[in-house]
Amino acid sequence: MTVDAPNRKQTIGIPTAILFMCGQNSIRSPMAEAIAKSLLQPDIYIQSAGVRSGEPDPFVDVVLEEVGLSLNHRRPHRPRTLEEIEDDFFDLIVTLAPEAHHVALELTRSSAVDVVYWPTMDPTVVTGTREQMLDAYRQVRDHLWKLIDKRMKPIRRPPPASG
């Protein structure tokens, strides 16, 4: 995959194409993609990918459904790698795991693409009851929600009209 930056809006620093990356595209990056698609303007192109392709994680569906979101909005989510992304023109890559950050920096070293690292815990390291494990996934969801909401305010969807 080559990662090139488009010229659309880039001069004013507002991303028009965002890629979220993690290790396997099964938890953190698809969760961030779903949240971003719900919070950001619909004309922002948003995708997610992993360094490797993992397996879908049902806990992600559970914690997203709790807030009215779904990975399966238009088609079932299938974890994918960078090579499987159809459109590779991103002007912002948000990495959520150290390995993904290193890969993104390597891929973009000769491109005008902004790469930012948002350290995000891997909820699969938490053991215990089902509820304890779900709490770890909720923490990741809420962490990503706050980061996207705070750091991408200029491209947020306008609030619904009241009345």
Task: Outline where the language-model segments fall.
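Short polar/charged helix/loop
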Residues: 2-163
